[in-house]
């Protein structure tokens, strides 16, 4: 028994020693594991910090604390020329200028532009929140200028699936055809009366008439019509307000970068935007309100235009998907988006061709070859009018409607072209710089439509490689490039087919100079026309 007790005691002692050793081993293992994990985490943090330190902002001026380069911006108007001069001085294709706390990133390189709008499109899918955009969008209820979020996604889906899909484009063909004929009739009346033709006035109002017809079913806001088919006083007021608002949209207003100054209106931008928006509302809202009432009361049941589509869309429960507060600013936004780009391209194209008669001759020869002189050019002819479209591509390239594309805001920190782009940065793709980049375009300042011709394929007005910008691309790109192509091409083709153009007496050349404050031709193009088709082909004003 003593032997058993002794053996038992030895066994207990051995077991305790084994457990003690196991516990020590487990503790040591856990300590080692924790230590290794901490080392790995520390290494990761250090590596990330090192990488962040390696990535710098794009080159640019240092600026003042807090306010950045705002003081210089205020005395450097127009701001777009100042920003391009900075890039030229630094010899860079991407730059960073801090305005307040906002990093403004400017880009003139197609490769970098593709990195932003193609490779990292989703990351740069937002818009800035500014005073002007808040006014125009009724508190960010629209599609084009509303920051990224649920409201943007809702409105973008409506526009893309209900308004500008291929089926809707075909459905509204007749309305566009009516405005093409109205353009020809209006210009015919001016030419027949020996009146000079202001191309800026005509091209803008053609585009305005077309979008009003598509949106509201009418080309005019007046009860009366002008005798020669031109716009009424109401239509002129609306167009002027629209271009006023366009000129102050994303226009480097001081309060956009120093929000504490909002309401002081130090440079007058806020009042201009309020007044312009109110004028457009004055013409749009009564039509919208009356149409909503007609649908609500059952007096209208057939969809005839974009406004009807907006009103008639239902949600999953059968209720109206959109409120009046969403419909009104979205219509205003879409109406504003239509006239400036096509009209500017056609005015510049005509000005360039007057100074280069050989290009004008080739364009008219193509129209005569494709269409002939026994009928008017139609949208169905557009695929074959490659030289005409090459002229328009060259106008978009060399003479963009604006110096910069609408801003793309970074939703998080990003890396572009090897540079650190902080969250909230505004990336501005330079329409001006992309189209005139000498690394991309040979002899970039010369107007040469032939550079866009490709014998193997049809010429299109879109530019997917972002070597220039006609209609912007990506999640925030142009929603209706097909409509833009139709309006721009038909506008130029009808003006060329129906009339022979020359400068007024005692003028031999057009001075191809940009305005001091924007990218439009400094002086509106005015010419004198002669009929070049059989008289019976010209439509009458209806």
Swiss-Prot record:
One of its GO terms (biological process) is secondary metabolite biosynthetic process. It holds the Pfam family p450. It is found in: Membrane. Its cofactor is heme. The chain crosses the membrane at residues 21-41. GO terms for molecular function: heme binding; iron ion binding; monooxygenase activity; oxidoreductase activity, acting on paired donors, with incorporation or reduction of molecular oxygen. Its EC number is 1.14.-.-. It is a single-pass membrane protein. GO terms for cellular component: membrane. Heme binds at residue 478. It is an enzyme of class 1 (oxidoreductase). Keywords: Heme, Iron, Membrane, Metal-binding, Monooxygenase, Oxidoreductase, Transmembrane, Transmembrane helix. It comes from the Eukaryota. InterPro entries: Cyt_P450 (IPR001128), Cyt_P450_CS (IPR017972), Cyt_P450_E_grp-I (IPR002401), Cyt_P450_sf (IPR036396). Belongs to the cytochrome P450 family. Converts tyrosine to para-hydrophenylacetaldoxime in para-hydroxybenzylglucosinolate biosynthesis. This is Cytochrome P450 79B1. It comes from Sinapis alba.
